[in-house]
Amino acid sequence: MPRKRHTRLVSQPTPISIQEILYTTRAMRRLRTDPVPDAVIARILDSGLRAPSGGNTQDWRFMIVTDRDKIAAIAPLYQAGLAQLFEGHYKQANAATRAAMASGTADRRTAQLGRVLDSSEHLAAHFADVPLLVFGYLTSRENAGSIWPALWSMCLAARAEGVGSTVTTILEMFAAKEVDEILGVPDGSGFYRHACLPMGYPTGRWGVPDRKPVSKVVYHDTWGTPPAFAPSEPLWSLHG
């Protein structure tokens, strides 16, 4: 039975700074089952559509899915796709990470990867309970550059609303046709799906994710030369 949608006007959340949005928007794969109200979804979508596209063509379509039966039908496709990914491209890294975690020899980066693997498996196991999916389509199969700014803007807008999100292409890699059939996308529509954003209120807390510092990944004028001003630690934190 479809879950009843929230149609009442939902007040906007307490504003947070752009720095907090940028620094704390990270992959949130552990989501509560609470529905995301329609008014919140509308703000996320409307904000995301302000993003640029190549030539301002806006040759995109976005599909939002809240129907419980459709999400339940998509869930096993996502689970099978993740299993294929873990048994294929990520098989060696997955096995090595699991072994290091089990033996207590994991370093900081390995432990971080272990948490990513755990949260990815959690999302797959609970995919049928995700309250909101956002799919991004373009008229181009190869040139996805025009869809990513809008999708990421939606992730940022979701963060401003207290809604967690993550970007995944597993369904596009392993179940493109099957998902389109579930969603009623006609053959020959001329649109190609590029990514899925599972969204929902997170079970955990927001925080600044562990990332390599500017000084390690940015060069200035010459390859291999970092900027003299490059910080080695985040310039912003939740604690000021």
PLM region descriptions:
Residues 7-14, 192-240:
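C-terminal helix-cap and adjacent tail motif
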Residues 17-34:
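Generic N-terminal amphipathic, Lys/Arg-enriched alpha-helix
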Residues 30-32, 61, 165-169:
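Short catalytic-loop micro-motif centered on adjacent basic/acidic residues
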Residues 41-46:
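Short amphipathic alpha-helical segments
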Residues 48-49, 132-182, 197:
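Small-aliphatic-rich amphipathic alpha-helix that forms the alpha element of a beta-alpha
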Residues 51-56:
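Glycine-rich phosphate/pyrophosphate-binding beta-alpha loops
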Residues 58, 64-145:
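Glycine/small-residue-rich phosphate/adenosyl-binding loop
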Residues 83-97, 183-210:
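A glycine-rich helix N-cap at a beta->alpha junction
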